[in-house]
């Protein structure tokens, strides 16, 4: 078993540099750190990958979708925005040399504007959108998981 911790345990905002906290996690004995992709840049992702390699600590990645990127939406443009956001997240996960991407990715983060209505349509839209990223996940050898909101 690998015991890890989410870098959000330490940060004050999603865009904060996670590298200092990766050091803290290693020092505390963790073997893995989950890093939010929100606010990450490709150059920052490369630095995180190098640091993780130097410290012999694994990285997993997490992200979320905005209302404008809601893959469960009935609006095709919004769905496509979400697919593109997930593709960027997959690329960033790969840059960090991580093998797992998770988060609230079946829909937009937060409470749905439909307040529980149209769940079957939302499920179909989400599923259809996720199918569009499976080949990229496979190509990059990244596992994908969803954290459903409560």
Per-region residue spans from a language model:
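Non-cysteine beta-strand/loop elements that form the S-adenosyl-L-methionine
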Residues: 58-65, 102-104
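Active-site mouth loops of central-metabolism enzymes
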Residues: 3-17, 69-83, 115-123
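Acidic-and-aromatic substrate-binding clefts and catalytic sites of carbohydrate-active enzymes
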Residues: 11-16, 35-47, 70-72, 111-113
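Active-site acidic/histidine proton-transfer and metal-coordination neighborhood
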Residues: 53-54, 76-150
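Active-site beta-loop-alpha junctions enriched in small/polar residues
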Residues: 8-10, 36-40, 64-67, 106-108, ...
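Catalytic domains of carbohydrate-active enzymes, especially glycoside hydrolases
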Residues: 19-41, 89, 95-100
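Aromatic-lined substrate-binding rim segments of carbohydrate-active enzymes
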Residues: 44-56, 64
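Short, acidic/polar
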Residues: 12-25, 47, 78-91
């Amino acid at each position: 078993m690998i015991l890890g911790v989410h870098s959000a345990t330490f940060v004050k905002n999603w865009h904060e540099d996670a590298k200092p906290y990766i050091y803290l996690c290693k020092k505390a004995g963790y073997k893995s750190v989950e890093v939010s992709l929100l606010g990450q840049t490709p150059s920052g992702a490369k630095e995180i990958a190098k640091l993780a390699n130097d410290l012999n600590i694994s990285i997993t990645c997490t992200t979320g979708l905005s209302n404008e990127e809601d893959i469960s939406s009935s609006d095709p443009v919004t769905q496509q925005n979400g697919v593109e956001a997930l593709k960027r997240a997959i690329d960033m996960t790969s840059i960090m040399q991580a093998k797992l991407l998770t988060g609230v990715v079946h829909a937009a983060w937060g409470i749905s504007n439909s307040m529980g209505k149209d769940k079957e349509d939302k499920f179909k839209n989400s599923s259809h959108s996720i199918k569009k990223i499976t080949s990229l996940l496979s190509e990059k050898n990244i596992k994908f998981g969803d954290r459903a909101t409560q």
